[in-house]
Amino acid sequence: MKKLSKVFSAFVKKPLTSETLESALNELNLLLIGNDVATETADALCEKIKESLKGEQIGRLTSKSKFLFEILRDIITEILTPERTIDLLEEIRIKNKSNNPYIICFLGVNGTGKTTTIAKIAYYLKKNNISSVAAASDTFRAAAIEQLSYHMQNIGIRVIKHEYKSDPASVAYDAVQHAKAKNINVVLVDTAGRQVSNKNLMREMQKIVRVSEPDLILFVGDSLAGNDALNQAKEFNNSVGIDAHILTKFDADAKGGAALSISYETKKPILFVGIGQGYDDLEPFDNAIFISNILDLKEE
């Protein structure tokens, strides 16, 4: 977050005139891209600033930095505002009224902290008196089944699992049936995390989604991965569909560009951010706090 804050701060303090605006925006664009903001997002942000300043006599503004700050805040708020907002606990309670479990499917590549994030969500639900069961539908790696079982055992959540290399969709199906039989509120479906270019993986994901009929498909992305995280989100969104995001390692992200890019490119909300290794190190993503952190600007 600190690096984006410095980028915006430097832009606001520039001696801008109508003549120098174009070169200042080009410089801002390059700095944004250098701080993990995707090219399309950086282009859009700069274009929106240009549109907002059209017709303004920049040099005559009595408080230029305040004016630019307000423009930036409005533009970034717009970028971070999703097509629809999701109140997870409320959605779960509404679905449970029909005596059916709420089903969450987790997508993401290996190494992003997906399995730990599933455990964090299970722990979060437990704290809110919502029961859950996990489906070990990453049958591609035996270690994935063991890892999920380890985390869920730590927080007292049952895992439905089959043999290594068994059909992932059938594991998800069995977990849903178990939840219905035992009146469990939520089913958490883990999935394989191979590279997104793997067509077999995408077919597997599509089958899991067809069989389990999730109410929510969550993409788990590593906020330190920058454009890689964005490309993964786009691939999953195009092939399977994504409803919302969770960004891991958010506490270590000095740049802050991934959140901005993923929000702009997918138009889906960021529900939570991971801020540590503990099961309670998960926070709801707060747009206002994020904007405040990346626009840590001082008025002239």
Where are these regions (language model features)?
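Short acidic DE-rich linear segments
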Residues: 1-6, 300
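Primarily NTPase-proximal linker/entry elements flanking Walker-type ATP/GTP-binding cores
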Residues: 4-137, 144-164, 173-179, 186-189
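Charged, low-complexity surface patches
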Residues: 21, 114, 140-141, 168, ...
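Short hydrophobic/aromatic residue motifs in ordered secondary structure
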Residues: 39-41, 141, 251, 279
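Short glycine-/small-residue-rich Rossmann-like dinucleotide-binding loops
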Residues: 110, 192-193, 222
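Short hydrophobic/aromatic patches at helix-to-coil boundaries
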Residues: 190, 299-300
